[in-house]
């Protein structure tokens, strides 16, 4: 066993002394040692209950003959970090999480690992660490929050964000907004729509690194606790059979994940996170692959923010297994891909009797919301290396549009203009120097997009940025424009009043400026370099690569 490096032999008597100091017995040290990575904290609603999940995991490990040893991981709440300097630290936290787990799991050589994330960057960060360490492992997340209420309707955090713009428009009072804010998020769990956290938790199932039910079983349910116990027991079986993450994460797992991503209408952040995760297994997931899969995979679900339904509705309709079963009908799933159950995807679907129980939530393959997937990759003179849009959340009027550029050098400047009602129908808001390097940190632009929707311009205004978007963003929000402005990308050359052509069906994003003028602008162009005081962000800016590559570190 790997743990023998710190438990066995004459020379390890000092190590055993330290382990005995933890209260462990000789019998416990003779069993496999299982690291339990718990990202619980009292700051993030999606993580407030993870101690309960961890206790269930440890009970499962003990029941199966192992000795669990818990250690912590950080987790940022993107909602709380939104629209201020804190958001610059969110994406970098993904790498910090992966690196810190590598440190702990190498310094203390556990035989197996159980990962307990829930919200945005904790899931990809832990998946990256899992593949990097490549010891028998399983992921069990905290589960989704239930939808809240507002004005007698289902509501979630995005309802509140959009309410800010509604107040400015006079369509809601501040008191009404405060009442909504008290009821929209009713308790623990990752925010209730198909936002980034739930997207990644659902996709962890499709990759095969989490048990069926991981993505949709509610956070506040006894079923979630039972699932955590099963995860603890299951990791012991993976250890016994020596099944490691890289045995599971193959090109077939990549294909399954991207197909499910498109069918579910997941967050555009998956286009950053999946390449970063799969890179740890030596697998290359390019924007071209996303686009290829999107063109031939129908969009079967429209959960919030694209529609009115939530993760609890997806769970009731059969969850991720039902979506995969529907995709399987058209041969879009690799049934022979291995999973942490020890069985293949196909065997899991058959054993579960996976089927859609509500076709209003999960559309049949022959009657999808759209014949193409939820995410589209755009290219053109404004985005030579690509840009990303959640086309399933774009109003029909904005799928093809020529718009007038309104240029802003930061999120704050754009948000101020929106709230001051200086943005008009037909505008394309350009927010630049918000990329991974130039931000630095690639902030999410949820506040501006929610404000656009809140003031009633969601079907009339586009937002284009080298930054990124929340999974809760809806509308013509085109992000990850690459190269970014800080790397000399064309987005840095856009001027106020330029015309921009958006053609999502044709996958085009073009700046309608002739080449001679572009050459003059390039010759006079010097990228803006922001003053950065944080040592972490300085290092991040030096090390990070393009969003087109998942914003991973240089290798």
UniProtKB/Swiss-Prot annotation:
Q: How is the cofactor bound?
A: Binds 1 [2Fe-2S] cluster per subunit. This cluster acts as a Lewis acid cofactor.
- Please state the gene responsible for encoding this protein: ilvD
Q: Does the keyword Aminoacyl-tRNA synthetase apply?
A: no
User: What is this protein for, i.e. what is its function?
Assistant: Functions in the biosynthesis of branched-chain amino acids. Catalyzes the dehydration of (2R,3R)-2,3-dihydroxy-3-methylpentanoate (2,3-dihydroxy-3-methylvalerate) into 2-oxo-3-methylpentanoate (2-oxo-3-methylvalerate) and of (2R)-2,3-dihydroxy-3-methylbutanoate (2,3-dihydroxyisovalerate) into 2-oxo-3-methylbutanoate (2-oxoisovalerate), the penultimate precursor to L-isoleucine and L-valine, respectively.
Family in the record: Belongs to the IlvD/Edd family.
Q: Which InterPro entries match?
A: Dihydro-acid_dehy_C, DihydroxyA_deHydtase, DiOHA_6PGluconate_deHydtase_CS, ILV_EDD_C, ILV_EDD_N, IlvD/EDD_N
GO MF terms listed in the record are: 2 iron, 2 sulfur cluster binding; dihydroxy-acid dehydratase activity; magnesium ion binding
Record-level GO BP terms? isoleucine biosynthetic process; L-valine biosynthetic process
Q: What is this protein called?
A: Dihydroxy-acid dehydratase
Q: Does the keyword Cytoplasm apply?
A: no
Q: What pathway does the annotation place this protein in?
A: Amino-acid biosynthesis; L-isoleucine biosynthesis; L-isoleucine from 2-oxobutanoate: step 3/4; Amino-acid biosynthesis; L-valine biosynthesis; L-valine from pyruvate: step 3/4
The record lists the catalysed reaction(s) as: (2R)-2,3-dihydroxy-3-methylbutanoate = 3-methyl-2-oxobutanoate + H2O; (2R,3R)-2,3-dihydroxy-3-methylpentanoate = (S)-3-methyl-2-oxopentanoate + H2O
Recorded GO cellular component terms are: cytosol
Which keywords are on file for this protein?
2Fe-2S, Amino-acid biosynthesis, Branched-chain amino acid biosynthesis, Iron, Iron-sulfur, Lyase, Magnesium, Metal-binding
What Enzyme Commission number(s) appear in the record?
A: 4.2.1.9
Which cofactors?
A: [2Fe-2S] cluster; Mg(2+)
As stated in the Swiss-Prot or TrEMBL entry, residues carrying the post-translational modification N6-carboxylysine are: 121
Residues noted as binding [2Fe-2S] cluster in the record, renumbered to the chain: 119, 191
